[in-house]
Amino acid sequence: MPPAPTPVETEFVISDDGNSAKPWQWFKYLAQSQSGYLLIETDAGIVTINPHAARERITYERLLDSASARESLSTSQTLLIPETVKLSPIDFARIQAALETVRRMGFQIEEFGQDTFKIDAIPQQIATLPVAKVLSTIAHDLGESGSRRNGERWRDELVAKSIAKSFAGASLALTEAGAVQLVEELCACRMPYVCPRGKPVMIFTSTRELDRKFARG
């Protein structure tokens, strides 16, 4: 059996920039469980974090911020080799109808033949995800939404949520430094407690609750 990981002893103090919900004043990263959950110690007790849900929340807010500020080009990552993605006729039509919204998220994308798009750049936040899967997810969610609502802000939120959702089943291997960075980025979110789909990002276990369960005090 491999030795247990050594906790990162540094305590990370969370700065107050006025934008974050500040779930805690400081944290100490402890470990990542075999099932992938992150464990940290805070001033409130022990916190268990779902890193996939955390990445969804971070990505969602950053995409919306970029779209609102019209800074999509500055937050895009240019592909070394442009990628072509062929979709079903229905999915192609859905992306085509929402092309400006997709571009606001950071995609440099254009039509490239029958039912095909050419992608020259993608949002920095999704550099590790397969582009075809992300576009298919966006198309699916656009189809599910139908025309029940309209408006630029609503479309931005829908597409950003679809892109972020692509992390749900993705591999997310984290080093200790990567885990700490993820927690720091989560702390800067406006709504760090739930992912865009409403699922919990973290579970708190207070020191008082731990003492009660262990019949201490």
What kind of feature is each model-predicted range?
Residues 3-217:
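Long, charged low-complexity intrinsically disordered regions
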